[in-house]
């Protein structure tokens, strides 16, 4: 994917793909990135290494650090994300004009 194909999209995050993503299609993101994606709505357009599809923003309450340190995990969910290799690095770009998220293998 070239800079030209990113259009006016802005980088919002750099992530390492977890070992779970290829199995469940969920790419964990930060609270800040989730906040940037919220205006796109419940479902939004997604482009993963040039392949188009749809995605949803998800969140899950968690106590993985103990009950006294409850927090929330945020993620982008799509079957397209299953194509990402665990341990690979990806960059997330938000194209606000096209109302879509681009995920590009770094």
Where would I find each of the regions flagged by the language model?
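Acidic, low-complexity intrinsically disordered regions
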Residues: 1-106
